[in-house]
Amino acid sequence: MWLITETWGDVVLNTEPITGAVTEAHRSSVEDFYKVIFDDLDVAVNQLAPGKSTDGRITQDVAKAFKARACLTRACATGEASLYAEAAVLAKDIINSQRYSFYTDYSDMWDIANCDGGTNKEAIFSINYTNSELENNAFDATATNSGNKGIVDFVMKYDKEAGMERDVLNARPFQRYMPSRYLLQLYNENIDQRYKVTFKDAWYANKNPLSESDLKVYPLMATGDTAIYIMKTAATDSQKVWASKRYRLLDVNDVYTSEGKAILRSQFVEMHKFADPTAVYNQDWCQRDAFVIRLPEMYFIAAEAMLQTNKQEAVDLMNEFLMKRAIPGKENDMKITESELTIDFILDERARELCGEQIRWFDLKRTKKLVEYVKLHNMDAKDNIQEYHMLRPIPQNQLDAVTNKDEFTQNPGYTK
């Protein structure tokens, strides 16, 4: 319900079971949606037992975490101080429950051994997935395969490069998502663990033996050695010379213009945290649970909610989190001061931590930064983004299906 109203605004709100064909659609306000959202969450908080969700079911902890997110979202829209305060209280309840904790090594957060949300230390709520071919409809030619598609959607086109062929380790290159230059440059990999865990920038020659054509392009290439290296910075002349006979080297200026527009759309630094080395060669799903809410978001919600009323506590919370993501020995370098904690810093931190987890558009909408950030950082969309994009268009098949077309119309700004 939160996703529906935040995506499309004043649309149809059903609170009773539908028993027959309904051909008319009538809008309900965002306020009506949030009344139901908060009422339902209050029931869950009051009636469910506290505890970690170990099986994909809702617990009191999950309800509190969702309500913290909903309170912050609604507070940003209405400016209600009580909603900001409640968001902070709920988020801190989860933080202080001692049922969730951070991995010392960030790579453990995304290790396939910790992909089960029921046992992952940072996961508050997750959608359960499996590697079962039967449960993922692999044997039904008429059905759409289910399962977590994160294993393939972020993978760049590596299998046409010299020395490379498609394999399980590198996954199927569906290349649906490409990181922006802006996102890559948000990370300081000298002090922050997350860049090297989140992204993949090197691919190793997996052909054995290498073909004649491979060695014609790179005569010093060797199986098991580097085949592709993509840099988030500019390469030096010496790096280019070294690579010229060994592997394909792409630096940030090969992949993007200086303004951030993509030059290459098939080769890029790959968002890699959803990789599954246990997957089967020809499948496009994996066993990873999808983490819907994780512990870091509680820190971000609390810090943002207290930004205007208790900034020092907000800074303390943010620093507590940042030190957990620091490279050992670099904890003090990761810490920030009160003057550095702004809504833009929080958004940058959310990008560093939550990229690829399908929450960014909602974050930018909530903070009324969507148009500003797209104009600054998305060169493909900057000339077209407008305020009406704060709502997404209602799917045309929904509009076609209703009989009261003059009353239930497309969201403002979109062509009918």
Regions found by a protein language model. Name each.
Residues 15-22:
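Short linear capping/connector segments at secondary-structure termini
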Residues 22-27, 93-101, 322-331:
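Short, mixed-charge aromatic SLiMs
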Residues 64, 69-243:
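An aromatic- and glycine-enriched ligand-binding surface/loop that stacks and positions planar moieties
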Residues 197, 201-323:
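C-terminal substrate/ligand-recognition segments
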